[in-house]
Amino acid sequence: MTGTLDQLESTIAARRAADPSTSYVAALFAKGMPKIAQKLGEEAVETVIAAMAGDRRGVTGEAADLLFHLMVLLAEAGVPFADVLAELDRREGTSGLAEKAARPKG
């Protein structure tokens, strides 16, 4: 299941050093975390809007955009996707309420 996301992570890393005038990914990195975070937020809102409208096709497209921009944000933050998967694995089998209660406060 992660093969596509692994490939996307590699593509994002490769395009990071590209010319921002010819690469959307390079342009995002050139603008830094504020722009990347803004784009992630926009895609999250668009995903919610499509879901609330019952637009399955829209949800699919917006979810793809959301995952793409999340991967860009993770790269900018220096967080490998494998770390996110490891955290999900760690939480597997733990009640959501128990896991949330165990998180550090603050």
From Swiss-Prot:
Top-level enzyme category: hydrolase
TM region positions: none
Stated name of the protein: Phosphoribosyl-ATP pyrophosphatase
Keyword line: Amino-acid biosynthesis, ATP-binding, Cytoplasm, Histidine biosynthesis, Hydrolase, Nucleotide-binding
PANTHER family assigned: HISTIDINE BIOSYNTHESIS BIFUNCTIONAL PROTEIN (PTHR42945), HISTIDINE BIOSYNTHESIS BIFUNCTIONAL PROTEIN HISIE (PTHR42945:SF9)
Known catalytic reactions: 1-(5-phospho-beta-D-ribosyl)-ATP + H2O = 1-(5-phospho-beta-D-ribosyl)-5'-AMP + diphosphate + H(+)
The species this protein was found in: Rhizorhabdus wittichii (strain DSM 6014 / CCUG 31198 / JCM 15750 / NBRC 105917 / EY 4224 / RW1)
Family annotation (InterPro entries): HisE (IPR008179), PRib-ATP_PPHydrolase-like (IPR021130)
Domain of life: Bacteria
GO biological process: L-histidine biosynthetic process
Gene3D superfamilies: MazG-like
GO terms of molecular function: ATP binding; phosphoribosyl-ATP diphosphatase activity
Biological or metabolic pathway of the protein: Amino-acid biosynthesis; L-histidine biosynthesis; L-histidine from 5-phospho-alpha-D-ribose 1-diphosphate: step 2/9
Keyword Amino-acid biosynthesis: yes
